[in-house]
């Protein structure tokens, strides 16, 4: 059977932990690391403060060498624009041995709607 993108996203969502924007803010306030898996231009336009950027397409190749992601037990909040790429990325991180990863429901779009913590931009 041929898979659709939504089938793949739904399969990922079945095996990961998703958190609301409010839960993500609480995790980040308590030391979790934000991982932005959007494309670089999206990240540069605006991102969660202190988020580390690794695009979805390069995740498997770059995460192991990134200094902030050496501890596979560290708490990580993964986000994208609306939640699909972050779900796929979170499932991938779990397969790579990361034990405490969360996908943020609604992504950066939803984070930005209630921006009591304003996004950062790249200069």
What are these regions (language model features)?
Residues 1-33, 40-75, 84-123:
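Rhodanese-like catalytic fold shared by cysteine-dependent sulfurtransferases
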Residues 78-79:
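Short, surface-exposed ligand- or partner-binding patches at beta-edge/loop junctions that are enriched
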């Amino acid at each position: 059977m041929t898979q659709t993108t939504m089938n793949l996203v739904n399969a990922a969502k079945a095996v990961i932990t998703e958190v609301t924007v409010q839960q993500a803010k609480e995790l980040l306030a308590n030391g979790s690391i934000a991982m932005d898996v959007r494309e670089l231009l999206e990240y540069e336009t605006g991102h969660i403060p202190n988020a580390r950027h690794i695009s979805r397409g390069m995740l498997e190749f770059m995460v192991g060498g990134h200094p902030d992601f050496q501890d596979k037990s560290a708490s990580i909040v993964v986000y994208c624009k609306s939640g699909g790429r972050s779900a796929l990325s979170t499932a991938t991180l779990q397969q790579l041995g990361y034990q405490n990863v969360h996908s943020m429901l609604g992504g950066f779009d939803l984070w930005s709607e209630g921006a009591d913590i304003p996004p950062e931009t790249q200069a």
